[in-house]
Amino acid sequence: MNRWRIPQWLEKEICARDVACVYCGITFGSAPDRGSQPSWEHIINDARIITRENIARCCRACNSSKGTKLLTDWLGSAYCLRRGISAGSVANVVKRALEHQPLAILD
């Protein structure tokens, strides 16, 4: 289990699936800057949901921009507009999350 509590078997599965950022599509390590390096992402911002449907890899730039925003809110941000990131352009794992994401998370 890594420091994000992702089991090793799931980490390997996700690394094989997500060879590029699930949001912007940049291939990891294709650019020399830190922003293109992979980072772990909870698509729905709930660290308790450790499933193949919620854990993904995205570039550090997208992860930093998304932060704790709801996915639907973030997709409408200036960052996403500038980079051409939309509900139609993201990876399939994100598209599936969008289909099931509640409009608001109640505590």
Language-model regions, residue ranges each:
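Short Cys/His-based metal-binding microdomains
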Residues: 62
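Short, charged surface segments at domain edges that flank catalytic/cofactor-binding sites
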Residues: 1-25, 49, 81-104
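Short, surface-exposed, polar/charged, turn-prone segments marking secondary-structure boundaries
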Residues: 65-71, 84-89
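Phosphate-coordinating loops and pocket residues in cytosolic domains that bind phosphorylated ligands
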Residues: 76
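Secretory pathway export signals and precursors
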Residues: 17-20, 54-58
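Histidine-centered nuclease catalytic patch
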Residues: 25-57, 66-73
